[in-house]
């Protein structure tokens, strides 16, 4: 009887992992639609090619080496197949690999409209094989940071990846954007920012809702169990808090944009939703629903401030606001954890955040610089004018009407 109960719990937890992983996988569609809606028509097919390509690269490279680097267990499939203690090892791998793809997807939008496609893919290989798995091994994997110190000894806590996944992706994106430079025509001779409008806001809105839905798998799956009353209650609370934070982010971003700009900016509302989701990801397990709403609301305000600051003050061109959503708000998410979790300290979160940022930013910067020196990372001015759909992919997403 006891063995039958164990087998039932094992099957339920494995199935739960797979379903949550499938929800996270669907976030790839969300990123694709969001980015396709926020770039110009002449660059749509290329951004979609980036997204499906990076997902395939992440799945392959993490299987070959990244998963072993992050968690150990032997190279290739030896560390993936077989029975775990409470669920299948393969279900754990599947859940983890879609997180890797999510982190890499963040980079795609930030470098949109002017990066060479295969230079991006080359970076994706290194990021998903080494850069992300190594920082993941220091956090969720429990390894020491180059043998110097252990984040677990400090008490660093990141429930589902505000820092480990989102801030890491934003750090890699920032390094790339700094070397890549802004899009042609983004800033005038005086350095003033000129708006470059996205082509399809309905598509961007659809992408945001897909991401919102997928986030329930992202955070809910990170409870790591479902087959007991306690774990089922925990998953339900994480779902509620995730939803509440996203709602808080939308409301705060909309109100703040209305006060600041005099208009209810849809793109800020969309980024507000994502900011709320990123903010709660580090600690959706401890706050009440109301506190989760407030954490998301702070994220919604921060993302509006950050997007404007990066664009107008720092002149860092991020077409979709990815660095602000996932980087700045990812940091806020880490720092918000001690507000509701008394076992976590601000100092631990700061050490963890600095470790993630410094490693990913420096390592990514070196890879981007090497790619720039060897094969180049930016398309020519003429290719940028024509649109990377034609120059990189040889086709157009909207062949009957393309506005250049």
Pin down the residues of each PLM region:
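Hydrophobic alpha-helical transmembrane bundles of multi-pass membrane proteins
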Residues: 1-404
């Amino acid at each position: 009887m006891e063995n039958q109960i164990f087998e039932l719990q094992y099957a339920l937890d494995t199935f739960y992992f797979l379903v949550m992983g499938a929800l996270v996988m669907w976030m790839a569609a969300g990123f694709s639609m969001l980015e396709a809606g926020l770039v110009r028509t002449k660059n749509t097919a290329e951004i979609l090619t980036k997204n499906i390509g990076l997902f395939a690269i992440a799945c392959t490279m993490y299987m070959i080496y990244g998963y072993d680097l992050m968690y150990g267990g032997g190279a290739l499939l030896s560390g993936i197949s077989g029975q775990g203690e409470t669920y299948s090892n393969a279900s754990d791998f599947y859940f983890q690999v879609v997180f890797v793809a999510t982190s890499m997807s963040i980079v795609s939008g930030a470098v949109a409209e002017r990066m060479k496609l295969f230079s991006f893919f080359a970076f994706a290989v290194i990021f998903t094989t080494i850069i992300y798995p190594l920082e993941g091994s220091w956090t969720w994997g429990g390894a020491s940071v180059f043998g110097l110190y252990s984040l677990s000894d400090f008490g660093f806590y990141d429930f589902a990846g505000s820092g480990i996944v989102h801030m890491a992706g934003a750090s890699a994106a920032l390094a790339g954007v700094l070397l890549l430079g802004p899009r042609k025509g983004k800033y005038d001779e005086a350095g003033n920012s000129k708006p470059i409008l996205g082509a399809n806001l309905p598509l961007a809105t659809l992408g945001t809702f897909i991401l919102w839905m997928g986030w329930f798998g992202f955070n809910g799956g990170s409870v790591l169990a479902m087959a007991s009353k306690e774990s089922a209650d925990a998953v339900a609370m994480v779902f509620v808090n995730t939803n509440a934070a996203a709602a808080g982010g939308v409301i705060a971003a909309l109100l703040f944009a209305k006060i600041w700009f005099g208009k209810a900016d849809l793109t800020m509302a969309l980024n507000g939703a994502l900011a709320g989701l990123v903010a709660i990801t580090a600690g959706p397990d401890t706050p009440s629903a109301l506190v989760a709403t407030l954490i998301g609301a702070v994220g919604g305000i921060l993302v509006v401030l950050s997007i404007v600051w990066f664009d107008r003050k720092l002149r860092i061109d991020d077409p979709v606001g990815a660095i602000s959503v996932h980087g700045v708000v990812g940091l806020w998410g880490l720092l918000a954890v001690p507000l509701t979790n008394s076992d976590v300290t601000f100092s631990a979160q700061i050490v963890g955040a600095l470790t993630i940022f410094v490693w990913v930013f420096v390592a990514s910067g070196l890879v981007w610089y090497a790619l720039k020196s060897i094969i180049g990372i930016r398309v020519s001015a003429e290719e940028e004018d024509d649109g990377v759909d034609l120059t990189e992919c040889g086709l157009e997403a909207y062949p009957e009407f393309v506005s250049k």
